[in-house]
Amino acid sequence: MPIAEEEKLLPLTQRWPRTSKFLLSGCAATVAELATFPLDLTKTRLQMQGEAALARLGDGAVDSAPYRGMVRTALGIVQEEGFLKLWQGVTPAIYRHVVYSGGRMVTYEHLREVVFGKSEDKHYPLWKSVIGGMMAGVIGQFLANPTDLVKVQMQMEGKRRLEGKPLRFRGVHHAFAKILAEGGIRGLWAGWIPNIQRAALVNMGDLTTYDTVKHYLVLNTPLEDNISTHGLSSLCSGLVASILGTPADVIKSRIMNQPRDKQGRGLLYKSSADCLIQAVQGEGFLSLYKGFLPSWLRMTPWSMVFWLTYEKIREMSGVSPF
């Protein structure tokens, strides 16, 4: 039988392995995003509270709005905007994760298996995993930056309505069109530097921790490559990712949500370093960990849902475990 005919008989996952892994990771990320999105919205709202730069710009809403913790912020969204508003911005979030998670997972596995040449005995040095995780995060997030920008801005629309401000967007596609019209292609990548910085740290925590812990447990304990091992590994990865990623997440959210001039330049911050300095000087060091609790509470279940779903659908699709 000709080689071309033999290839046609192979399962799709073997004929197009990278495409299959991209789609499977996108599906797993969609499930995780839908399950935990209200915590992401709460986190974003918390990160915008008491923004010192807005006060200097003359936004009176900053002075009048009382500070709320995580629970009161979430309850406030339900009471003042409606229960379904907890999922405001979920559509661009799903768009983002299809691109972001697909890109980062395919990149990490390619680096691990092809570039760094994971050895046959499954030993994989931590430093290689760290580099692979950071590079995967950078590539995945750069590709997904436009969808992340729209997600962050749409998450703040409900708050703008309560403050009596005009809404900026009618929907996801209008948001893309408006940002593109006002800032051009460059406008869709606003905040990309702090975004990829955060993604590098988060994926160093998530991918590196999960991969390292999982294979350590499989090789050095009685645990097998099953749901228990996946669950323990994902718990660890969610915690480490939250600790490493929250400060960069605060900076990223503020830069992406700031008002801009006609050239697409931010009116509050010149750069991510400027945003960092203003936050620490105006609000204190702990302002960098605003939203840490909902971030951790979201990252941990998100990580669990994602990894358990991803490992399971890989198994069901005939793809080898991660």
Swiss-Prot record:
Membrane topology according to the record: Multi-pass membrane protein
Gene3D superfamilies the UniProt entry points to: Mitochondrial carrier domain
Protein localization: Mitochondrion inner membrane; Cell projection, Neuron projection
Catalysed reaction, written as an equation: H(+)(in) = H(+)(out); chloride(in) = chloride(out)
InterPro entries documented for this protein: Mito_Metabolite_Transporter (IPR050391), Mitochondrial_sb/sol_carrier (IPR018108), Mt_carrier_dom_sf (IPR023395)
Molecular function GO terms recorded: chloride transmembrane transporter activity; protein homodimerization activity; proton transmembrane transporter activity
Major place of residence: mitochondrion
GO cellular component, one term: apical part of cell
Transmembrane segments: 22-39, 87-108, 126-143, 194-211, 228-247, 287-310
Top-level division of the source organism's lineage: Eukaryota
GO biological process, one term: negative regulation of mitochondrial calcium ion concentration
Annotated Solcar repeat ranges: 20-114, 124-216, 225-316
Keywords of the record: Cell projection, Membrane, Mitochondrion, Mitochondrion inner membrane, Repeat, Transmembrane, Transmembrane helix, Transport
Similarity annotation: Belongs to the mitochondrial carrier (TC 2.A.29) family.
Subunit structure: Homotetramer.
Summary of the function given for this chain in its UniProt record: Facilitates proton transport across the inner mitochondrial membrane and may dissipate excessive proton gradient associated with oxidative and metabolic stress at neuronal synapses. Regulates glutamate-induced proton conductance in astrocytes, shifting the energy metabolism toward aerobic glycolysis and lactate transfer to neurons for ATP synthesis. Can transport chloride ions with lower efficiency. The transport mechanism remains to be elucidated.
Full protein name: Mitochondrial uncoupling protein 4
The organism's taxonomic lineage, starting at the top: Eukaryota, Metazoa, Chordata, Craniata, Vertebrata
Gene from which this protein is expressed: Slc25a27
